[in-house]
Amino acid sequence: MFFNIFKSSIKGFLLNLPTPINLNYWYGFGSMLGLIYSIQIISGLILSWFYFIDLSGGFKSLILIMQDVWGGWFIRFIHSSGVSLFMFIMYLHILRGLIYGSFCKVDVWYSGILLLFICMGSAFLGYVLPWGSMSYWGMTVVTNMLSAIPMVGVYLVETIWGGSSAGVSTLVRFFSFHYLLSLFIMVFILIHLILLHECGSSNPLGVYYSCEKFTFHPLFSLKDTLVFVLVVFLYWFCIFVCPYLLLDAINFEEINFMMTPSHIKPEWYFLFIYCILRSTPSKLGGVILMVMAILMLVFLGIGKNLGSVLMVKTLYWKLMLSSFLLVFIILTIMGGYTVEYPYDILGNVNSVLYFFIYVIMLLYSFMFNFVY
């Protein structure tokens, strides 16, 4: 009986879901994220069986996984490449929402932004676990930014570190938090899907007619199957062709507590906010701007459906969105360079442009919602 109830729930939740007939491949990113997340959970579980933390950290366990465990290199590359694919497709998923005005579905949009924050936190914690030179010093720099919080900042940093400096106890905490946040992601994915299915999916035209819908299976499930083939190909390419492309070479060095790397940088999907952070002379101001760089997406959800649908069809919105995407790419590239001329100037200018275009987009959105 329980199996029949579970089967009918899954069937109604996924297969018989009413779906607009004009969805294109831009709407397949959510399914791709679900597949990659499942692969990340399985590969992460296998890696946790062989990952250990000793007095020198987790660097030796990574060498053990890569050299002594049968197929360990394969699982490790699946997990390390999967997070880059996951964040890249998540950014495309957000871009699709900006293009087609999906932010008018406020509950779904807000749950997605919260999910983005949790995924970024989990990705950062996982980046620290190899305990290489770049992982350690990057973690030290990022966590030390919390000391900019008035009154409680220093105590918060020492609590996270487990002492007056980052060490093995910090790594133990990060491993636990990485595991917990992965489970939280699963919960918020379910919340995101429930909210999406409650209000219904948007479509490229922005029209809402319940009669112009098909069940998700078999037409759209077949389309998602083709998307899954693309995901498998991307995994194959990243694992067997360029597994080290997105990994920093300095992270293959064991930690030297007496010497920092000449240029500390995070993973590529954090480079745009890292560039904004280092372009701000104030530590507290940099932390605030770094958070606001993503949190400002929340304000796009404040408005009416009609105004948002009409706004995203205008030429001005498309020009602003294209400019915003270009600035985002430039910030990502500049964040990977050292702080020297002309990269520092380009980073400062594009950081200002990033928020300027954001404010213009918000004002344009408020104007449309006021008129319509």
Swiss-Prot record:
Cofactor names: heme b
Major place of residence: mitochondrion
Binding, a ubiquinone: H197
Subcellular location: Mitochondrion inner membrane
One GO molecular-function entry: metal ion binding
Topology term for the membrane: Multi-pass membrane protein
GO biological process: mitochondrial electron transport, ubiquinol to cytochrome c
Protein keywords: Electron transport, Heme, Iron, Membrane, Metal-binding, Mitochondrion, Mitochondrion inner membrane, Respiratory chain, Transmembrane, Transmembrane helix, Transport, Ubiquinone
Cofactor comment text: Binds 2 heme b groups non-covalently.
Positions of heme b b562 binding: H79, H178
Superkingdom classification of source: Eukaryota
Amino acids binding heme b b566: H93, H192
Subunit structure: The main subunits of complex b-c1 are: cytochrome b, cytochrome c1 and the Rieske protein.
The family this protein is said to belong to: Belongs to the cytochrome b family.
Primary role: Component of the ubiquinol-cytochrome c reductase complex (complex III or cytochrome b-c1 complex) that is part of the mitochondrial respiratory chain. The b-c1 complex mediates electron transfer from ubiquinol to cytochrome c. Contributes to the generation of a proton gradient across the mitochondrial membrane that is then used for ATP synthesis.
This protein's name: Cytochrome b
Source organism (scientific name): Leptorhynchoides thecatus
Lineage, broadest ranks: Eukaryota, Metazoa, Spiralia, Lophotrochozoa, Acanthocephala
